[in-house]
């Protein structure tokens, strides 16, 4: 993760217009949402609920077939009002998170995660499950801030991504 030169080599941006995007996003009439991946967003600690909501909505808008948000139980109602397409999971402990870690095709960890005990449980359980199930992870914000604490305790999943500007900082 700290090898920013290598990261910049694999990070390729491509300018697209609405016509190109429409062609890429075309789905057959008999397509099922299960064919387009399951994103699990983990975040939205107390006082930071909006970040998890925004990441979840972005996943829906990008075309993910299923999107789940694992967040504090105090954010469930607001989350469902904001984006009813998202399956909101009340998670107030690492143990509560475990049951949602077996089905995603990608885990997004960090939006509004914070840096308290709850945050540490979320990162520990998600790293453990991603490694075990060979699921790629996108780690953002406080997820990246907490990552060094866990690198020695847990092997990282094979595919871990983060924002280039955060990784280069």
Language-model region placement:
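Small-residue (G/A/S/T)-rich helix-start motifs and N-terminal tracts that mark the onset
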Residues: 1-141, 145-169
